Design a protein with these regions (language model features):
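Short glycine-dipeptide loop
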Residues: 78-79, 156-161
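Class I S-adenosyl-L-methionine
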Residues: 168-217
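S-adenosyl-L-methionine
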Residues: 84-131
Length: 217
């Protein structure tokens, strides 16, 4: 018998379980050995925008459980991906892992020291603890995206790319302005693997400008 709340509606956990069981990307992730269905989101983003070229140095922020890291190493190659998360994560073959909280003051320096030379791609699938209040959740994820962008502005090599998750809403004007100032091309994209009912979308910024061009010199 279906589990229901006092109001006769299915519990959130039951709805989540049914959604997982009926989700083709969940089944595909298990079949293909990916740690999460989110792997297909990055694969679809890269199929469209080609940011993960072989040999490019990549930082994957908020990497756990590792689905995006798996796709990144498949496409950029072994030895070119640094996975970063505030929580521990099972290692992904061919990558390095750094436990680091991006909210800490020394985070950018710590990540910069861990890099091997240039940085060509910054990925962020970071998401806040969802409250269910759309405006609050939107503000929180914009803050995470801004933190990821701040790291990119400090460490990204000219010509590099930035991919980050945002929630649809009206508070990301300053973020988009910064992206358009720092990158020659900025696009929004909702990959097919992103659930239709989800407010998430992704910003894909490409061809990072060098410092002089950013300042308008």
């Amino acid at each position: 018998m279906p589990v229901k709340t006092a109001r006769g509606r299915k519990s959130a956990s039951t709805r989540w379980l049914q959604r997982q069981l009926n989700d083709p990307y969940v089944a595909a992730a298990k079949a293909d050995g990916y740690r999460s269905r989110a792997a297909f989101k990055l694969a679809q983003i890269d199929d469209k925008f080609h940011v993960l070229e072989p040999g490019r140095q990549v930082v994957d922020l908020g990497a756990a459980p590792g689905g995006w890291t798996q796709v990144a190493v498949e496409r950029a190659g072994a030895g070119h991906v640094l996975a970063v998360d505030s929580q521990t994560m099972e290692p992904v073959a061919g990558t390095r892992f750094l436990r680091c909280d991006l909210g800490e003051e020394e985070a950018v320096g710590t990540i910069g020291e861990a890099l091997d030379g240039q940085l060509h791609v910054v990925l962020s699938d970071m998401s806040p603890a969802v409250t269910g209040h759309a405006a609050t959740d939107h503000l929180r994820i914009v803050a995470l995206c801004e933190a990821a962008l701040a790291l990119a502005e400090d460490l990204l090599s000219p010509g590099g790319a930035f991919v980050a998750k945002v929630f649809q809403g009206g508070a990301q004007g300053d973020l988009l302005a910064a992206l358009k100032c720092g990158f020659r091309t900025v696009r929004h994209f909702k990959p097919p693997a992103s659930r239709k009912e989800s407010a998430e979308t992704y910003v894909v910024a490409m061809d990072y400008r060098d410092g002089e061009k950013k300042r308008g010199a």
